[in-house]
Every structure is written in structure tokens, then in C-alpha cells.
Amino acid sequence: MGLKISDLIAKEMPLSPEEIEVVNTLIPIKEFKKGQLLLKEGSIARECYFNIKGCVRSYQIINGEERTTQFFVEGDPIASLLSYLNKSPANHYFECIEDSVLAVLRFDDEQKLYNQYPKFEALCRNSIEQEFGKQQEILQNYLTKNPEERYLMLQENRPELLQRVPQYHLATFLGVQPESLSRIRKRIAHRNKP
């Protein structure tokens, strides 16, 4: 794997040779297998990630059942911010649901990077703000739309997930049982028939 994080960052902002060396040292790219957990509930997040290839889901276990709260695909930052910043136990899991390639940044290395090169803080802040906006939209949709409307929004805004993610994970993300998701899909398909 010849890809380096500097290749991706250079698309967003120019990097000096020194900065290239530093970011490639502090932010290694690692491969993770499908099913591998990046974070467990109750542990402290000491790393954040940037998804280069693959799909990661965030989920919680509520009353013994998994509830998916987010899917992270190529180009998405992956962070348990409260745990990472406050050094408090996480209340969720991060699981690779495909073989994944992620850039990995440890908290201490992030601080070194910001202290040495402040321009990276603005880049990371922008990424976090975009992810925060996505989270707000997910919450708003969950509170104001019924499962069929949420499915249609997912179909419109993130259609790749419908092909990549197992139906049972999609169902928990939408807040329904897999059987209900099957009925929703059939209803939509029936309505869309010519």
C-alpha cells in the first residue's frame, strides 16, 4: 500500500517537504479487517480516524439490541469526540463492516501536530464541523420523520449504503426491525412500478 496521508492532505492545502514528513510519521495508514472493533463501549478513545477505504459503523447496545447510529465511508472522519477529548468512557462501538483502510491519529500526536503546525488545526476543525452537521441531520430526521421517510432520504442522499450495508444494520439505523425494512422496500418498489 503506497498511499500516504500527505497525498490526501495535499489535495486540501499545500504542504512543505517538512510537513509531508511529519504528517506521514504522525498519521500512519493502517488496514483493518471486516468485523474488527476500533472502539468498545466503556473504553476511552485514544485515536481518531479518517476513512480512506471501507465502511465503519457506530452502534450502541440498548436493552440487549444493537442500534446503529452512523455509517462512515470514504472521506469521513471517525471519532468518538466526547471520549477522545474528555478521556471519558465511550458509550458506543466502532466496527469495520468491510475491510477498511484508515488513517490513524493518536491524541498526543494530534496535539504535537497542532503545536508545530497550527494550519492543521483548521483542517481538522473543518472536518469535525462537517461531521457534526451530518450528526445533527441524522438526529433531526430520526425525530421528525417516520421510518419510510428516513429510508427515502437515505436512498436519495446516501444510495451507496443501500448496496454496501447489510439490511439488518440499515434496519437498526432507521429504527425498525429487518422485517419492517423489507415491507418498506416492497411498498416503495410497488409505488415506483410503471
Regions found by a protein language model. Give the residues of each.
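Short beta-strand segments in beta-sandwich/barrel cores
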Residues: 28, 55-60, 101-102
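Cyclic-nucleotide recognition modules
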Residues: 67-126
